[in-house]
Design a protein with these regions (language model features):
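Transmembrane-helix signature of polytopic, membrane-embedded enzymes
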Residues: 136-158, 192, 323, 327
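Membrane-lumen/periplasm interface segments of specific transmembrane helices
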Residues: 45-64, 73, 211-312, 321-329
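Signature aromatic-anchored transmembrane alpha helix within multi-pass, membrane-resident enzymes
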Residues: 242-246, 367-397
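Short hydrophobic/aromatic helix or loop-helix immediately within or flanking a transmembrane segment
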Residues: 72-114, 279-285
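Loop-to-helix entry region of an early transmembrane alpha helix in multi-pass inner-membrane enzymes
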Residues: 99, 103, 113-130, 296-303
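Transmembrane-helix motifs of polytopic, lipid-linked glycan transferases
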Residues: 107, 119-142, 308-315
Length: 398
């Protein structure tokens, strides 16, 4: 929670510090910025995750998936995004999938020798590295603690839904654009934040959380400027950001509405693929069924992830951070939990975008020795991969 006074008090009112300039302070080698270590940790975890998946796929229950590692990478909704990247939208029903990620795949696939699958994986990997870099940087701004920042990034990389960070899925791109937009908000670079939010609005419907963050940051800035009767230069940027931020999301929703000739066109299409908002009813029904009939392992594990996310959300509200970051996290979690009714097993993936939920856990783990943390993170990475494969083999959703 923000301390009294200025909403961006402490060091956050300043520009984010150039971390590489004070390498000695953070215990890193001179010339190597701390976020680079976060990106390298993320890369190492993804390699471990792919190795774990390669080991598990031919064995036990996972052999029923009948797929190789390459087939896994392009499975489930990956196929939808690849079709859109190559052929556009052949049917209006496909409009439920946002165009930003397929457009990025299409652009990379123009490079000679790169297949659509290779392009999709390239976008995912590059975006994941950018997200890890940004998350480490934001963590350093919020906490000033090197270990907490790196741990927060590592915990995001091993989150229960993180298997899609190694697949042709848009979550990595969404997280990368979102985290850098949040950094821009914290730095008060209003136009950059608005531009990135517009892009996020073409990638995923969860962009509504980022629009909320821009609103929570820009509106008070406008009110303060008006009360102080400040010059135009003090308030035009937050005003423009407030107006521009929703345009990506609203623009695509409007485009779909025109295509299907209904103002609620996108929401109707989402309902037709057994998704949409059920305001948590699917979770309540699963919980009731588990209490009455006893839970299956799939339901029990998924409900455990949901309960942990809810607890971390409440705990994160006690963390000091600008209100816009709290707004983003709350809306992401509420949107993830209110989405249903069919894909209960997709909740962990939906929650992956709540990147700051790892901050309380990172603080808790900080006192541990490095020789304890490294195997712990490795085990969590393997467990997360197992869980992702389990959801695909039993829960019918990555």
């Amino acid at each position: 929670m923000s301390p009294p006074g200025h909403p961006y008090s402490k060091s956050t009112v300043q520009r984010i510090r150039p971390i590489s300039a004070a390498a000695g302070e953070y215990g890193t080698s001179p010339g190597f910025p701390l976020p680079l270590y976060g990106a390298l940790i993320f890369a190492g975890i993804r390699v471990l995750s792919l190795a774990t998946a390669s080991f598990l796929l031919p064995r036990g229950k996972f052999s029923e998936l009948h797929c190789s590692l390459l087939q896994l990478i392009r499975s489930w909704d990956s196929g939808r995004y690849l079709i859109i990247a190559v052929h556009g939208y052949p049917h209006d029903a496909n409009l439920v999938w946002f165009p930003g990620y397929p457009a990025a795949i299409h652009a990379i696939a123009w490079i000679p020798g790169i297949s659509p699958v290779g392009a999709g994986l390239s976008v995912t990997i590059a975006a994941g590295l950018a997200a890890a870099w940004g998350l480490t940087r934001l963590g350093m701004t919020l906490t000033g603690d090197r270990r907490v920042s790196l741990l927060m990034t590592a915990l995001w990389a091993v989150a229960p839904g993180s298997i899609v960070l190694s697949m042709v899925y848009p979550e990595a791109l969404f997280c990368a654009l979102a985290i850098w937009s949040l950094i821009a908000l914290v730095e008060r670079r209003w136009l950059t934040a608005a531009g990135l939010t517009i892009l996020v609005g073409t990638v995923h419907g969860s962009a509504v959380a980022l629009v909320a963050a821009v609103t929570v940051a820009a509106l008070p800035a406008l009110i303060r400027a008006a009360r102080a009767r400040q010059h135009l230069a003090a308030w035009w940027r937050p005003a423009v950001a407030l107006l521009l931020a929703p345009l990506g999301l609203l623009g695509y929703w409007g485009y779909v509405a025109g295509k299907v000739h209904r103002p609620d066109g996108w929401f109707l299409l989402e309902k037709n693929v057994h998704n949409g908002f059920d305001w948590g009813q699917s979770i309540m029904l699963a919980l009731r069924d588990a209490i009455i009939n006893g839970p299956t392992a799939f339901v029990a594990l998924t409900l455990l992830v949901i309960a942990a996310a809810a607890a971390l959300t409440v705990r994160s509200l006690t963390e000091w951070m600008p209100a816009c970051l709290h707004a983003y996290t709350l809306v992401i979690v509420l949107t993830a939990l209110a989405t249903g009714p069919y894909y209960l097993g997709s909740k962990p993936r939906f929650l992956l975008s709540a990147m700051l939920l790892g901050l309380p856990l990172a603080r808790l783990l900080t006192p541990a020795r490095t020789w304890v943390l490294i195997p712990l993170i490795a085990m969590l990475a393997a467990a997360s991969t197992w869980f992702g494969l389990y959801l695909m083999s039993v829960g019918w959703a990555p």
